[in-house]
Amino acid sequence: MRVKDTLNLGKTKFKMRGNLPVNEQKREDIWAENKIYEQRQKLNEGKPSFVLHDGPPYANGNIHMGHAMNKISKDIIVRYKSMSGFRSPFVPGWDTHGLPIEQQLTKEGYDRKKMSTADFRKLCHEYALKQVDKQRTDFKRLGISAEWDHPYLTLNPEFEAQEIRTFGRMAELGLIYRGKKPVFWSWSSESAMAEAEVEYHDVTSPSAFYAEKVNDGKGVLDENTYFVVWTTTPWTIPASEGITIDAGFDYSVVQPAGEDRKFVIATDRLNYAAEQFGWEDVQTLQVIRGRELDRIKAIHPFDNDRELVVMLGDFVTLDSGTGLVHTAPGFGEDDFRVGKEYGLDIFVPVDDRGYMTAEAGPDFEGVFYEDANAIALDKLKASNALLKQMDYVHSYPFDWRTKKPIIFRATPQWFASVDKIRDQILEAIEDVEFLPDWGQKRLHNMIRDRGDWVISRQRVWGVPLPIFYAEDGTPILEKETINHVADLFEKNGSDIWFQWEAKDLLPEGYSNEHSPNGEFTKENDIMDVWFDSGSSHQGVLAQRDYLEYPADLVLEGSDQYRGWFNSSLITSVAVSGKAPYKKVISQGFTLDGKGHKMSKSLGNTIVPDEINKKMGAEIIRLWVSSIDSSSDVRVSQENFVKASESYKKIRNTVRYLLANTSDFDPKENGVDYNELRPEDRYMLVQFNELISKIRTSYDNYDFIDIYKTLLNYIITDLSAFYLDFAKDVVYIEPENSLKRRSMQTVFYKILVGLTKLITPILPHTAEEIWEYLREPEEFVQLAEMPEVANYTDGADLLSKWQSIKELRSHVLKALEEARDSKMIGKSMEAKATLYLDESTKQLVDTLGVDLRLILIVSQLEVKALSEAPKDAAIFDDQLAVEITPAQGEVCERCRMTKTDVGSDEHFATLCASCAQIVTENYPEAITEGFEEK
């Protein structure tokens, strides 16, 4: 027999390395086979509900790190709620219509203009489902627990039907109308766009200052006077119909030296203009208030047959330009508004693909709009109207899918009126909680300032607008027809809109006074995809009886304030008068390590699959819990290396606890709270505080606080304190001694509680740990979160032990100094003499603390503070410490230096305490003796 055979050296099959990339997938298979998600839902039947509604990601390509961050965040919340007394189902969704899928098929060689709409839509449908399967696999690999077999897809007939009914309700309320006004127009997509589909980039455009000659000065200006206007879109000059000024600004009529012409410029911009044009000795002839110039006429700079009218508008500024704005009502929202006020025609000489039409004039016809800039500038020069041309850097809208610039273009479109229900929507926002709280103001301002929603799209892969036209062109948006279409879609899918005649899509026997011959046609446009996802509160929440409407929570990227948060809010308030969610959490974007947007072309992407294969999904999940995702998040390999190191600390700590409870059965060996040793009772109370803090952080969605609290507890309270001296009990003391079982009781309670607490973040690891615990639930996901206990002496214990730990830190410092001076090697070679004041000594005595144990020294002596020698290390007014080498020899078993080593005749290398333990528990050692080293 060897001495080590008499020690209770912990053993466990729980490996130091998790081999996560391999073992996680095996565990996910086990979850699927055992239907863990379904079991959890069944357990929670009848409990209060908590519904997190999944904003649908777009079904195109593998998931990126932003997807991972978002879905893992949701999973953490849902798992926690499910283990905390809530019925919390999670239905994942996908946005499956839209331009990117059409574009992808075009890349694969399909030309939608050379095939039937029905055939092209079939290809889109098949492609979308493949993408859903691909992303579902990616999400499941991250350990996301969800209703994977019954997700919601915006292409599902039942969803499309509810979307049509949502549209119908809005039409019934008079919120749907057809109008011609400028909308974001993507020539690269050949379709109108919503604000949520637009992104902005800085671009350099040719800007021009040019003069427009007064034609009818109304007795205010003579005909040798020119308005100086400014534009950053010279290509729109062919569509110019007026000049907009501000009624309250002062405008100066000036004449520079050497010029026959007189010019009108906003007085506050005169110095700037003179500098730009190189004017000298500028003479001010007249100062006129803007309102006096109203309806004065000017001549178009390169079309003498066209008159321009001076108009008063509220959008003119003095920040740039001249205070006079070139106005083309067909190409700008403000221009359109002021043009309508003045009764101007809406002139739009650009086609769907961005090419100028014949209306623009022979020099422009067939020219791409960007190329028309140069022609317009040349014509200004030729007519001596151009005063200055310069490059201008400004923010410009782009199609977020094609990454091409877009234009404002007035076209006939279908709109959802926001204006009619704006006040209701703003009121609904007041009832919603936001995290971060600035989200409320952001969404409020967006709704306050946004225009009506253009919901029609000139594409084919989407939900058709359920609108019919009578023989005289009257649009038909009746409750009867729309609901009938919804019923047809629910039964047959929306493809029938493109396969059936209009008469077959109308209710049997339907008639309309505008179609005396019974002839009808149908709308060709489809709905904006934001109307698809924006109807999910009706298509999912209100449809599935185990969900709730409104949802308790939505959690998406901050771009969704203008996207899904926005569109779903509008439709929900329209159909039900309330917001579709009670709380909104927004997250920032994932950027590369340098703060740049991730892009395949830049080669700076890190994708979840790469980390999964290299380190495991648990590392991504732990990383998600370690970041503040309320703002933009930088992602680098170093982030995951750091998360991996933290994971190892958690795993190794758990492994130590498992190894040292392998012979512990809580039912047979557990020690009651009142019988626990002082240090163990304190650790249990402290762990109870940890449970309280972490659960509060979960409730507040404060993942980073959970991460920090957990790591600090493991490193500081367990590893550096409790487990630091634990081996002197669990290894050394008799197997069934109260001292050892007391500590094991706390070890086990910490293990069980800790495993439950980390389950939402590290479910794979938690399940692996759970297999080694003697708990009734087969899977930890089917257990409940640890409850916060009420220890009557808890607060008192925490306060007193804080003093003990401060004392310990002072002694450890003195031991460190003794090591540095070579007085001792390990702390077990030391004797510590503590000189305590009366209150501290009384505290130690009251608690019954084994100070020698927690200080990890071989010998300890406690004396009055008044006896402290001058060379003792003094800490405040309560403690002095003297470290000296311990007297005696080192016990081969407990490694303590003692004066009674060899006092037992049978065990020459053991101290008296170890000799007694061996004699009582290993009597064979007396006759056999120990093997020599």
Curated annotation (Swiss-Prot):
This is Isoleucine--tRNA ligase. A motif ('KMSKS' region) lies at residues 597-601. It is found in: Cytoplasm. It comes from Pediococcus pentosaceus (strain ATCC 25745 / CCUG 21536 / LMG 10740 / 183-1w). Keywords: Aminoacyl-tRNA synthetase, ATP-binding, Cytoplasm, Ligase, Metal-binding, Nucleotide-binding, Protein biosynthesis, Zinc. ATP binds at residue 600. GO terms for molecular function: aminoacyl-tRNA deacylase activity; ATP binding; isoleucine-tRNA ligase activity; tRNA binding; zinc ion binding. Its main location: cytoplasm. Catalyzes the attachment of isoleucine to tRNA(Ile). As IleRS can inadvertently accommodate and process structurally similar amino acids such as valine, to avoid such errors it has two additional distinct tRNA(Ile)-dependent editing activities. One activity is designated as 'pretransfer' editing and involves the hydrolysis of activated Val-AMP. The other activity is designated 'posttransfer' editing and involves deacylation of mischarged Val-tRNA(Ile). Its EC number is 6.1.1.5. It catalyses: tRNA(Ile) + L-isoleucine + ATP = L-isoleucyl-tRNA(Ile) + AMP + diphosphate. InterPro entries: aa-tRNA-synth_I_CS, aa-tRNA-synth_Ia, Anticodon_Ile_BEm, Ile-tRNA-ligase, Ile-tRNA-ligase_type1, Ile-tRNA_ligase, M/V/L/I-tRNA-synth_anticd-bd, Rossmann-like_a/b/a_fold. L-isoleucyl-5'-AMP binds at residue 556. One of its GO terms (cellular component) is cytosol. NCBIfam families: ileS. GO terms for biological process: isoleucyl-tRNA aminoacylation. It comes from the Bacteria. Zn(2+) binds at residues 891, 894, 911, 914. Its cofactor is Zn(2+).
